[in-house]
């Protein structure tokens, strides 16, 4: 009498005890050949991804005192209160002010080593308007029997101008509205000739109010970058300013929850690994010590001044810097241990690990291993 098979796990049940076949190998089997009657969505797992992150690169405006004194609308930026919203807007949009003692802009509201604008990433609600890639084609005119032929006639890359609508959570005191007003007002003042960019931007004929928007789509564990997209350059072109002046007697107290800013973008980059490299280069340009450690291969080592924060400890640290591992596509978050807040958290976690109460992270995120990614950044299919 044949003995009933004993299955050790659920995967063996699907593989040997079910006509649907293996769930783990369903992708490779769908690629390899036809499975009549048993293939399709029943065994193939859906593509699960997280929304990920939206990063906005800081522009390089010239908001020095000399420029601000040229126009009365910028007078409000020249406050002696370092930790105020006007100083935050001024230093965020002009990183050079932070290291200029005479400008009195060493505010604790920003991390000047961060190339991105954290408040926009943290408060981003939605981004819409990215164009699709298309293949241009040309079709001949019809012949006597209405026959025609068609060929590819163009490039697939998108270098066109398009608009992105980005919605942000509108918090108390409206720092985002003030930030974009300063940004857009400065751009128009440069056009009028009332404000002047920094001399190096004039010498190299560069535009200083441009930014770049990065979209990072993450895997279901929020560990690896599944897709990356970015525009060539972008700059804001709208500011919802008329709505706050409207009036209705039946709504004396109304919450302005979201604010939508339109960006004019030039070019869209998809499925191009150069976006990964440019993302990292942006981070390195704003942080000389990080750039040095990457060049010398020290980043992530024991002698590094940057600590790679694991997933379960990210909320314990401040001023984290994102950096993409080109080989594995892992989005790593580094804490600068030269900052007192991060050093305190780092020392506390080390003491916690030595105690008997410390338990390593368990669950789905603990099972994520870099070995599933090869050196080209492509996920290996289980066969």
Provide a role label for each language-model segment.
Residues 1-383:
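Glycine-rich, low-complexity intrinsically disordered segments
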């Amino acid at each position: 009498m044949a003995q009933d098979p004993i299955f050790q796990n659920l995967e063996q049940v699907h593989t040997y005890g079910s006509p649907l076949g293996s769930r783990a190998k369903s992708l490779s089997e769908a690629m390899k050949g036809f499975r009549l009657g048993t293939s399709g969505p029943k065994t193939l797992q859906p593509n699960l991804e997280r929304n990920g992150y939206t990063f906005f690169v800081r522009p390089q405006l010239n908001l020095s005192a000399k420029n601000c004194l040229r126009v009365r609308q910028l007078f409000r930026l020249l406050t002696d209160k370092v930790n105020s919203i006007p100083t935050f807007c001024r230093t965020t949009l002009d990183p050079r002010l932070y290291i200029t003692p005479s400008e009195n802009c060493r505010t604790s509201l920003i991390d000047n080593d961060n190339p991105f604008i954290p408040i926009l990433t943290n408060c981003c609600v939605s981004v819409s308007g990215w164009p699709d890639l298309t293949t241009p084609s040309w079709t001949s005119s019809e012949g006597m029997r209405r026959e025609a032929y068609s060929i590819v006639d163009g490039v697939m890359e998108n270098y066109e101008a398009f608009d992105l609508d980005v919605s942000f959570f509108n918090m108390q005191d409206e720092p985002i509205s003030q930030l974009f007003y300063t940004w857009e007002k400065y751009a128009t003042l440069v056009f009028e000739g009332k404000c002047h960019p920094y001399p190096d931007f004039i010498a190299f004929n560069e535009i200083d109010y441009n930014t770049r928007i990065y979209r990072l789509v993450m895997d279901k564990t929020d560990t690896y970058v599944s897709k990356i997209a970015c525009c060539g350059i972008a700059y804001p072109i709208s500011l919802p300013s008329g709505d706050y002046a409207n009036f209705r007697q039946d709504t004396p107290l109304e919450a302005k929850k979201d604010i939508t800013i339109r960006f004019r973008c030039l070019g869209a980059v998809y499925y191009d690994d150069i976006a990964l490299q440019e993302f990292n280069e942006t981070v390195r340009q704003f942080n000389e010590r990080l750039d040095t450690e990457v060049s010398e291969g020290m980043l992530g080592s024991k002698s590094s001044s940057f600590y790679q924060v694991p997933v379960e400890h990210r909320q314990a640290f401040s001023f984290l810097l994102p950096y993409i591992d080109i080989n594995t596509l892992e989005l790593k978050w580094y804490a600068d241990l030269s900052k007192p807040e991060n050093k305190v958290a780092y020392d506390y976690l080390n003491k916690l690990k030595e105690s008997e109460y410390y338990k390593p992270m368990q669950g789905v995120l603990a099972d994520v291993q870099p070995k599933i990614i090869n050196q080209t950044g492509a996920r290996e299919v289980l066969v």
